[in-house]
Regions:
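Conserved N-terminal beta-strand and adjoining loop/helix that marks the start
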Residues: 5-32
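Charged phosphate-binding loop/patch that engages nucleotide di/tri-phosphates or the phosphate backbone
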Residues: 143-169
Length: 169
């Protein structure tokens, strides 16, 4: 199939999405989270995993490796796809988010301007000011076995801008 036969022409009123990755790096029973800088437009002062936009020449797995290395300085292993979100934020463009977990043998992290990195015990993570979807998804992810298939999640927002997460069965 040629590039022109892929059906990527959005003039037919199709909904476009931006691909992103989100990664949770584990070391023992701790999870690496970033407290986003107060000057950030998206999720200032809130805790989230690391990640970002998938570049045009990347696949989701390569992007996850790159984002982890860029934002933490860590080399990781056992990078596993845990969830795929389809996010409808009531705009012309949505987001497809690939959520990964990874293991790190090191706790030596690099500073960056995105925020501050913190190793947080898994059993106390819900006590932090997390990005709004994490209290819903992290318990599922932490309970997964390495061979479990990824979760598929549709995320939307109601008229009061409250999040709704629907997990595929």
């Amino acid at each position: 199939m040629s590039a022109s036969e892929q059906g990527a022409d959005a003039t037919a009123g199709r909904w476009l999405t931006i691909p992103r990755t989100l990664c949770f790096v584990m070391n023992g029973s701790d999870v690496l989270l970033m407290k986003r800088s107060p000057h950030k437009r998206i999720f200032p002062n809130r805790y989230n995993g690391v990640g970002g936009h998938i570049e045009r020449n990347e696949d989701p797995l390569s992007s996850a490796h790159r984002e982890i290395l860029e934002e933490t300085g860590l080399e990781v292993h056992d990078l596993l796809l845990r969830a795929v979100y389809n996010i409808d934020a009531n705009q012309e463009t949505g987001i497809v988010l690939f959520v990964f977990t990874a293991q790190s043998d090191s706790r030596n992290i690099s500073a960056n301007d995105e925020g501050t990195l913190h190793w947080i015990p898994r059993d106390s993570i819900l006590q932090y000011d997390l990005v709004e979807d994490l209290p819903f998804i992290l318990p599922h992810i932490f309970a997964m076995n390495p061979t479990d298939p990824p979760l598929f999640v549709h995320v939307s927002y109601d008229e009061d801008d409250c999040i709704s997460m629907r997990f595929a069965k």
